[in-house]
Each structure stands twice: as structure tokens, then as C-alpha cells.
């Protein structure tokens, strides 16, 4: 709406000089909640498109796609992801966890891992073990997402952002790791998770921070509602 209104304002401003009346002169542009706009920047469909388009033809590309899976299925902050080592990838009975040691609260957190992410992590670990002739124990002290296995230095924030930005270019969007965190939170809200569940999943200390995802859900639901056809029944 704002785009159309802006175009009309520009058009009529030029026509005013010819004595024509400007019908949109005093109409103000709608205020846009930039926070909500940022939250809705990346959808689960966008993630699927990136996965389908991303060509895995090297060790780094294998690492990068595993990063995307991890960001989406855990909602991790960048710092939490970059400090992960293979020793933090744990199995208890039939369940897998990440031990997060660099959380915003300063406390260790055990985060359950979705089965789809477990599959991707297992594939990635086996790939590295095969490529470098290592066993599981050899990888324990290695960063999961390093510059290279031999160097064993964690990726920098700048490198992580560049990786996600390059992926975003595949779908014509300028995105960041935090946009992926927004995407999973919004998806959880749309799937029926309540505000406390989303707060705990994301590691928020206050539900006020989480409320933006509930508001985002309302906007998406309204958009869906607007697509419903009208049903006009004749009154008897």
C-alpha cells in the first residue's frame, strides 16, 4: 500500500504545478512495524528453497548447509553456534542434545535436537571422519563449524553472516543468521506453540521479547483470512 501511495504522491506532486488538484496530498503513509517486518523476512518455504538450490560440492558447502539446518532447528544465537564443539553434541539413550556453554544467561543449557538435524549432523561428522581418517574421539575437541578441520579455528561472525547472505542471494533476499532464528520462532507460533514454550526454546529471559512472534502470527493469519472468498447468501 505504501509503495502505491508513494508513487501517487510523486505523480500528483508533479501535476500540481499544472494546476491540478492533489487528492493524496494529506494522506499519510501507513506506519510499518520494522520489528515485525524483520521477523517475517524469512519463511520456512524460503529455507526449503535455499536447501533445494544450494549445491553441495565441497567440504565448506557441506559445512554451510549443516549450519543452516542447525540455525533453523535450534533457533541458536550466532555465538552459541560458533562455539559448538563435537564434544557438545551428546546422546542420551535415544535422544540427542547440544550442550550450550556460551548462552546469553551464562548458564549451560542442554538443547534437544530435532531428528532431521541429527541426521544431517551424523552425515556431516561421518563425512569429516572419512575425509581426514579420524574416529569420533579425534573430533571431540574440534569445532563443529570451523574454518577447516586441520586448522580447527571457529568461524568468525563475519564469515557466518557471509555464508547466510550468500544463501539468501539464491532466493533474492538479504538475510542474516538472526533471520533464521526469527523463521523458526514464527513457525513454532503458527504451529500452536504458546508464548512460554517459544520463550524457553529461544532462551529469552522475558516474554515481552517473545511477543513479537505472536504478533507476527496474527499478521500472517490475517493475510490468509483475506484470501478466503466471499460467500453471499440471499436472505429468505
Task: Describe the role of every protein-language-model region.
Residues 1-236:
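Conserved catalytic core of the tyrosine transesterase superfamily
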Amino acid at each position: 500500500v505504501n509503495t502505491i501511495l508513494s508513487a501517487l504522491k510523486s505523480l500528483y506532486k508533479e501535476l500540481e504545478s499544472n494546476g491540478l488538484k492533489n487528492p493524496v496530498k494529506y494522506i499519510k503513509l501507513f506506519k510499518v512495524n520494522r520489528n515485525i517486518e524483520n521477523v517475517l523476512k524469512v519463511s520456512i518455504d524460503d529455507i526449503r528453497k535455499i536447501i533445494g538450490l544450494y549445491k553441495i560440492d565441497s567440504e565448506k558447502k557441506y559445512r554451510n548447509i549443516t549450519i543452516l539446518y542447525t540455525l533453523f532447528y535450534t533457533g541458536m544465537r550466532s555465538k552459541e553456534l560458533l562455539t559448538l564443539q563435537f564434544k557438545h553434541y551428546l546422546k542420551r539413550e535415544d535422544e540427542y542434545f547440544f550442550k550450550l556453554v556460551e548462552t546469553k544467561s551464562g548458564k549451560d543449557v542442554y538443547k534437544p535436537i530435532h531428528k532431521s538435524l541429527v541426521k544431517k549432523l551424523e552425515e556431516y561428522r561421518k563425512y569429516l571422519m572419512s575425509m581426514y581418517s579420524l574416529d569420533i574421539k579425534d573430533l571431540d575437541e574440534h569445532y563443529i563449524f570451523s574454518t577447516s578441520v586441520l586448522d580447527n579455528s571457529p568461524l568468525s561472525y563475519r564469515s557466518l553472516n557471509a555464508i547466510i547472505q550468500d544463501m539468501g542471494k539464491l532466493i533474492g533476499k538479504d538475510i542474516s543468521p538472526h533471520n533464521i532464528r526469527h523463521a523458526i520462532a514464527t513457525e513454532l507460533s503458527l504451529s500452536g506453540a504458546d508464548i512460554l514454550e517459544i520463550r524457553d526454546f529461544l532462551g529469552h529471559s522475558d516474554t515481552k521479547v517473545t511477543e513479537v512472534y505472536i504478533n507476527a502470527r496474527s499478521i500472517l493469519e490475517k493475510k490468509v483470512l483475506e484470501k478466503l472468498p466471499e460467500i453471499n447468501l440471499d436472505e429468505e
